[in-house]
A protein has these predicted regions:
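C-terminal functional extensions of proteins
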Residues: 156, 166-213
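Short glycine/serine/threonine-rich phosphate/pyrophosphate-binding segments
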Residues: 79-82, 138-144, 165-169, 191-195
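A short, well-structured juxtamembrane/interface segment
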Residues: 50-65
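Buried hydrophobic positions in well-ordered alpha/beta secondary-structure cores of metabolic enzymes
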Residues: 75, 158-160, 198
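N-terminal glycine-rich anion-binding loops that anchor highly charged ligand groups
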Residues: 27-41
Length: 213
């Protein structure tokens, strides 16, 4: 078929068919499968089928939080931009990123720390169900772990998929050591687009007829 004849929906549908075919009959728990496949769709990287880890009934907890009108906090404006605003609106949810907020920048300067750390501190003031989606800054995950240990914050879900070489693996393992529902990309891979893909996969399971794989 000529690409000009394919509507965006057809391209996406065919992409997911190819992903299913190339997974070779491999299966995943029903609530996790759409997440794994959407991350593969976003990255064209099948290694996520092995590296994505779901802890403490993470997918189920995430869907409950979204149905309850959760706030989704991201660590980058790129991840924020990638999360479906129509899907959030349907559920009465919202997504925020504090990284560019003047008060966060000022707090980071005063404490000699990063804006990612300061943004996690600010998140302690969020009321209602909270989902934290980290796709860039391992320092955000490390600070979040400290805040959870101190019982200053209790996310319904943490998406821990920062990418890079310094403190990334360690931060992800620190998250996995906590008793919090989490979706983590083990190893060095991840990124803001992966964080957004995970959130969209969860949202679409509720907002799209029949869900989305």
């Amino acid at each position: 078929m000529d690409s000009k004849e394919m509507a965006p929906g057809d391209i996406e549908r065919r992409s997911f068919e190819i992903i299913t075919e190339e997974l070779g009959g491999r299966t995943f728990p029903p609530l996790e499968e759409p997440v794994v496949k959407r991350v593969i769709h976003t990255t064209a990287d099948f290694s996520y089928a092995d590296s994505l880890v779901f802890t403490h009934d993470a997918a189920h907890c995430a869907l409950d939080a979204l149905r309850a009108g959760a706030t989704v906090l991201t660590d980058t404006n790129m991840a924020l931009a990638g999360i479906s605003k129509p899907a959030l609106a349907k559920l009465g949810c919202k997504a925020v990123c504090y990284m560019a907020d003047p008060d966060v920048a000022a707090a980071a300067r005063a404490a000699g720390t990063t804006r990612a750390v300061a943004s996690m501190d600010k998140a302690c003031g969020i009321e209602g169900p909270l989902i934290v989606a980290v796709g860039n800054a391992p320092t955000a995950l490390l600070r979040l772990a400290e805040l959870m240990d101190a019982r200053k914050i209790a996310p319904a879900l943490v998406v821990g998929v920062p990418v890079g070489f310094v403190n990334v693996v360690e931060a992800k393992e620190e998250l996995l050591a906590r008793r919090v529902p989490a979706i983590v990309a083990r190893g060095r891979k991840g990124g803001s687009t992966v964080a957004a893909a995970i959130m969209n996969a969860l949202l679409y399971q509720i907002t799209r007829p029949g869900g989305s794989k």
